[in-house]
A protein has these predicted regions:
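Short histidine
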Residues: 16, 34, 107
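Non-catalytic signal-transmission and effector/linker regions of two-component phosphorelay proteins
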Residues: 1-5, 109-112
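STAS-typified acidic loop motif
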Residues: 5-31
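Amphipathic alpha-helical interaction surfaces in cytosolic regulatory modules
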Residues: 21-98
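Short secondary-structure boundary/capping segments
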Residues: 3-5, 13, 68, 90
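Polar low-complexity intrinsically disordered regions enriched in Ser/Thr and small residues
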Residues: 11, 64, 106-110
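Short acidic-hydrophobic, aromatic-tinged amphipathic segments that line or gate anion-handling sites
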Residues: 99-103, 107
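Residues that form or immediately flank small-molecule/cofactor binding pockets and catalytic motifs
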Residues: 8-10, 83, 105
Length: 112
């Protein structure tokens, strides 16, 4: 799973560069996310999912596992959810667990 990270003063933005997070890639995604978040001290971690067209239950579980792996003082936020991925979060009520930003990371400059 290819992920690209960009760190600012108080936010680490991680962009998923594949079109799906599923059973075949969930473990690799989770391990890479833990590596990237472990190398950062930013209190906010934003996962840009704008290129993710498909997310199955394994992928959703991997995103939740990343959230649980962060220190209690850090937040995992999501951005750029496609309609299909947004539906998965809504149907599973995970949209109440995560802060979800509309659009991509450009809109995060003004997000609080």
């Amino acid at each position: 799973m290819e992920l690209v990270a960009q760190e600012g003063a108080d936010v680490l933005v991680i962009r998923a560069m594949r079109d799906r997070i599923d059973a075949a890639s969930a473990i690799q995604f989770k391990d890479k996310m833990r590596e990237l978040t472990g190398n950062s001290v930013a209190p906010r971690v934003v996962l840009d999912m704008s290129s993710i067209a498909f997310l199955d239950s394994s992928g959703l579980g991997a995103v939740v596992a990343v959230l649980k792996s962060l220190a209690p003082t850090r937040k995992l936020e999501l951005s750029g959810l496609t309609p299909t991925v947004q539906k998965v979060f809504r149907l599973t009520r995970m949209d109440s667990i995560f802060v979800i930003h509309d659009g991509g990371p450009d809109g995060l400059r003004h997000a609080g």
